């Protein structure tokens, strides 16, 4: 089921207490309730997190987005939501290699929270979004694979995070360790 939020300027349409009530009622029927928070840290954000038990912070590898994510993490940790997790969106491996985009490890070090997924900047996302179709329909597309892996981690599976453009496995990790 999907319940989209109203696109109004008035973020007081639902207050924090009402959001808690709503999520508590939904918890009786559903195992997972995903709430997409509005950008920024205004009242809409505070209302959205009022009923949350867990938070996934989604950011891009841009300095301004990472600063915003850091502020969000601070707010989440000062509320009742502990141990927020991180998804890094729109990573471009070629830009990371050239030093034009921050590396995933640097972002994780800066934000100091657990990484549960990295989504590559993939043209497939644009085409699927424009068609109104889910990206995960194509499990072979890099973005589709990334979302499937994130879902598995949310459900508790312990699988390695795939970082686009990076070799995976034990020896690759060992090589990276000695490079530092």
PLM segments and residue spans:
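Phenylalanine-focused residue identity feature
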Residues: 1, 30, 45, 124, ...
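P-loop/Walker-type NTP enzyme "switch/lid" segment
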Residues: 1-28, 127-136
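Short, solvent-exposed coil/turn elements at secondary-structure transition points
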Residues: 6-8, 90, 121-122, 141
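Conserved active-site and cofactor/substrate-binding residues in soluble primary-metabolism enzymes
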Residues: 14, 67, 102, 138, ...
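Conserved catalytic-core segment of NTP-binding enzymes
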Residues: 17, 21, 25-28, 32-121, ...
């Amino acid at each position: 089921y999907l319940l989209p939020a109203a696109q109004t300027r008035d973020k007081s349409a639902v207050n924090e207490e009402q959001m808690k009530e709503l999520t508590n009622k939904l918890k009786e029927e559903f195992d997972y309730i995903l709430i997409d928070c509005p950008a920024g840290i205004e009242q809409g954000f505070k209302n959205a997190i009022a009923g949350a038990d867990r938070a996934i912070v989604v950011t891009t590898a841009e300095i301004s987005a990472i600063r915003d994510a850091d502020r969000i993490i601070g707010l989440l940790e000062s509320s009742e939501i502990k141990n927020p997790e991180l998804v890094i969106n729109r990573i471009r491996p070629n830009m990371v290699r050239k030093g034009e985009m921050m590396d995933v490890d640097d972002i994780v070090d800066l934000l100091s929270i657990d990484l549960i997924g990295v989504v590559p900047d993939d043209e497939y996302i644009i085409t699927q979004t424009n068609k109104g179709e889910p990206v995960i329909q194509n499990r072979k597309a890099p973005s589709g694979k990334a979302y499937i892996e994130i879902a598995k981690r949310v459900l508790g599976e312990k699988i390695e995070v795939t970082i686009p453009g990076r070799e995976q496995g034990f020896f690759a990790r060992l090589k990276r360790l000695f490079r530092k």
